[in-house]
């Protein structure tokens, strides 16, 4: 039977992970084994469970217990299920987007890029992308369009932050990912060196005098290719572009010279992931 706990006070400590803790507090960088993340909606929670993530607690409207969330509850063992009236839960930021169900999961132990990429042919590498919506959208495209892994540099948004998980529709649990380096100083020098040591050629998505079209045959012929994508505003750092094996552009019309990084990633993954 589900371990149901009734909540009658919005300030109850059981709601802290869902209502009051910041992303950094949830992540618990100093004690990563205590870190958690929040997944929202039955579909996203199911994908986390499918991927083997450990549920810590759930929060849902009462009507969900015998409704759409009933199957999820059978998979969560004795994790406490906090429940309350919709009127109380409506005070949670973004609750309307959750379909009435949230779940706190234990963060997994970090994995190394080398471990993830042993058999990978195509990987996405994200540099300094801090917008969680873009990170989530990139993961969704990576899952749909044949990327074997996603690597992020230390200045990127956490892929397990709440909005990134939501926008990815749970695909962040399906695509293996790892952080490439411990501090911003490890990128691009050490990060690109590690990619080369793993056998990858690197393709910087950027406009420059030496950019080749994304359908260039040499790119398709590479046995292992890392597609490097930059921050929303300024794009990739000049040092990153200069250090990559290729600089790649997407041919465009009507005088447009760039796309949002999430849109550009989808085009790049479709063309280069085939």
Describe each PLM feature range:
Residues 103, 141-145, 159-173, 238-274:
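Structured adenosyl-cofactor binding patch, chiefly the S-adenosyl-L-methionine
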Residues 5, 108-210:
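RNA substrate-binding interface of SAM-dependent RNA methyltransferases
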Residues 4-11, 80-85, 176-187, 248:
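Short acidic-hydrophobic, aromatic-tinged amphipathic segments that line or gate anion-handling sites
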Residues 1-68, 156-157:
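Boundary-proximal intrinsically disordered activation/regulatory segments immediately upstream
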Residues 75-94:
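A glycine-rich helix N-cap at a beta->alpha junction
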Residues 67-78, 240:
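Short, aromatic/basic amphipathic alpha-helical patches
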Residues 203-254:
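Active-site/ligand-binding-proximal alpha/beta "capping" segment
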């Amino acid at each position: 039977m589900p371990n149901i706990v009734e909540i009658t006070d919005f300030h109850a400590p059981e709601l802290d992970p869902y209502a009051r803790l910041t992303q950094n507090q949830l992540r618990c960088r100093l004690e990563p084994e205590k870190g958690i993340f929040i997944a929202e909606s039955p579909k996203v929670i199911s994908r986390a469970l499918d991927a083997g993530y450990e549920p810590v607690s759930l929060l849902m409207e009462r009507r969900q217990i015998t409704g759409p969330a009933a199957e999820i509850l059978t998979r969560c063992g004795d994790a406490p299920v906090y429940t309350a009236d919709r009127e109380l839960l409506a005070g949670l930021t973004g609750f309307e987007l959750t379909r009435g169900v949230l779940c706190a999961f234990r963060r997994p132990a970090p994995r190394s890029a080398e471990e993830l990429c042993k058999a990978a042919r195509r990987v996405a590498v994200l540099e300094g992308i801090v917008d969680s919506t873009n990170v989530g959208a990139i993961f969704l495209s990576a899952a749909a369009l044949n990327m074997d892994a996603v690597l992020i540099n230390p200045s990127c948004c956490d892929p397990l932050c709440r909005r990134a998980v939501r926008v990815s529709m749970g695909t962040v649990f399906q695509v293996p990912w790892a952080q490439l380096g411990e501090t911003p100083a490890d990128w691009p020098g050490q990060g690109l060196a590690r990619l080369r040591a793993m056998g990858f050629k690197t393709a910087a998505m950027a406009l420059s005098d030496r950019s080749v079209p994304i359908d260039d045959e040499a790119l398709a012929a590479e046995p292992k290719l890392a597609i490097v994508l930059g921050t929303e505003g300024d794009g990739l750092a000049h040092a990153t572009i200069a250090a990559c094996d290729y600089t790649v552009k997407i041919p465009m019309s009507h005088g447009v010279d760039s796309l949002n990084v999430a849109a550009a990633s989808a085009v790049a993954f479709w063309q280069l992931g085939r």
